[in-house]
Amino acid sequence: HQRKWPGFKDQSNYIVSLANYEWILFMDADEIISPELYLEIQSHLNSNSNNWDGFYFPRKTRYLGSWINHGEWYPAYDLLLYKKDKGKWVKEPHATLELDGKAKYLKSDCLHYTYRNLSHQLGTIDKYTDMSAIEMEKEGVGSLTFQLLFRPLFRFIKGYFFKRGFLDGVPGLVAAITTSFYVFMKYAKLWELRIKNQPQIGTDESAYK
């Protein structure tokens, strides 16, 4: 099936509509089910008492040569297994599953082999913050002064100190900083987007080419 790219949300819902079975396992190409998670899933699905409509997986990320065990990155629970008629993907650019039913949090990890290196991560941040800024503009996000100043700082403090990202050494520090940087850039790009949409006097855009 080939079609024009409609965005992450619509594409996700379209893909799910093609499935023929009751349960949907929706994972990215860089995610793997650990043997322990496989057995846990099988145990629940084969149980006669199973009355769940979806399952959250704790996602453990491989980053800069180490497994991240703390901070905002772990456990990063994702609703990845659900009944087809109970779920709908919403939001952009990070499509989120909206479940009409009950979900259970599993204990075993889904393994996430993320960025190849920091250059790969920064490129991904650049791409997704572009899309995030556009979506926030559509949603009418208000004053940006507070967002630019405090949201990135709060995210760093939350991930590195409150959620003990410091226990993961240098990779934990870099993860906390780049998460904070992502937040800063999406609001900075929203500000830039609004400036570009305002009438400019005496500016020759060709000078930047």
Regions found by a protein language model. Name each.
Residues 2-8:
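Short, acidic/glycine-rich phosphate-metal binding loop used to engage nucleotide
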Residues 3, 27-29:
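Catalytic metal- and UDP-sugar-binding loop of GT-A-like glycosyltransferases, i.e.
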Residues 10-17, 23, 27, 34-196:
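Catalytic-site signature of metal-activated, phosphate-bearing donor transferases
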Residues 200-209:
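Short, low-complexity, charge-dense intrinsically disordered segments
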